[in-house]
Amino acid sequence: MKKNTLSAILMTLFLFISCNNSGKGGDSASTNPADESAKGPNLTEISKKITDSNAFVLAVKEVETLVLSIDELAKKAIGQKIDNNNGLAALNNQNGSLLAGAYAISTLITEKLSKLKNLEELKTEIAKAKKCSEEFTNKLKSGHADLGKQDATDDHAKAAILKTHATTDKGAKEFKDLFESVEGLLKAAQVALTNSVKELTSPVVAESPKKP
């Protein structure tokens, strides 16, 4: 959902809430049973739900950006160095610094996931992403003998962070699981936000008058 669209929705909610809460002096509460028989959506509750859902989506997108950064490093930077002429040039089997960077990003991913608000409807997706993140970070750490040296080989680096590599025993399998779990979490969060917005258009429900 675009930021401008969400801002417009929240502004409209604010105006509706302000109008509903304003009165012309005295008791503004309706005493007409017909008024009480028609109930629309609770705008205050929906406004909070939309705001919370949007904040959650933005937080997950931050995590997604970090995951994608590791994916880009894996696809483009293994066995490479900065070159003045072509941008990147071959530097085989010198991947220690690159892997240290990937590990640092992985710990940040775990940290950000641990701070996510535990929304009840997304608790399964949140728990899965947290588990995958911890497993990926621990896998990199446990492989420090091969991954923690400056002359870490290209094959070892690919086995650690390239999710499409044939050998994935040093972390790439766990990274693929993390990648997919964060994708799933983001999609679920976006659906939750969309559903919150849809509540604004829910039809007014007319209740049957209560018998005296």
From Swiss-Prot:
Membrane topology: Lipid-anchor
Signal peptide start and end residues: 1-18
Lipid-conjugated positions (N-palmitoyl cysteine): C19
GO CC annotations on file: cell outer membrane; cell surface
Location in the cell: Cell outer membrane; Cell surface
Induction and repression of expression: Poorly expressed in vitro in strain N40, expressed for a short time following mouse infection, then it disappears (at protein level).
Keywords from the named record: Cell outer membrane, Lipoprotein, Membrane, Palmitate, Plasmid, Signal, Virulence
Traits of the deletion mutant: No change in ability to colonize the tick gut, greatly decreased migration to the tick salivary gland during feeding, about 800-fold reduction in transmission to mice. No longer binds host I.scapularis Salp15 protein (strain ATCC 53899 / 297).
Residues linked to a lipid group, S-diacylglycerol cysteine type: C19
Role description: Major immunodominant protein in mammalian hosts. Required for initial stages of mammalian infection. Exploits its interaction with Ixodes scapularis salivary protein 15 (Salp15) or its paralog I.ricinus Iric-1 to increase mammalian host infection. Binding of bacteria to Salp15 or Iric-1 protects them from antibody-mediated destruction in vitro, due to interaction with this protein. Preincubation with Salp15 or Iric-1 allows bacteria to infect mice that had already cleared a B.burgdorferi infection, showing it is important in bacterial colonization and dissemination.
Subunit structure: Homodimer. Binds to tick salivary glands; antibodies against this protein cause a decrease in Borrelia movement to the tick salivary glands during host feeding. Interacts with host Ixodes scapularis salivary protein 15 (Salp15). Interacts with host I.ricinus salivary protein Iric-1. Binds human (host) plasminogen.
Family, per entry: Belongs to the OspC lipoprotein family.
Additional remark text: The causative agent of Lyme disease, the bacteria has an enzootic lifestyle. Larval ticks are infected with bacteria during feeding on infected hosts (mostly mammals) which retain the bacteria during subsequent developmental stages. It is transmitted to the next host when it is bitten by ticks. During tick feeding (which can last for several days), bacterial migrate from the tick midgut to the salivary gland where they are transmitted to the host. This gene is encoded on a 26 kb circular plasmid (cp26) in strains B31, N40 and B.afzelii strain PKo; it is probably encoded on cp26 in the other strains given here.
Record's protein name: Outer surface protein C
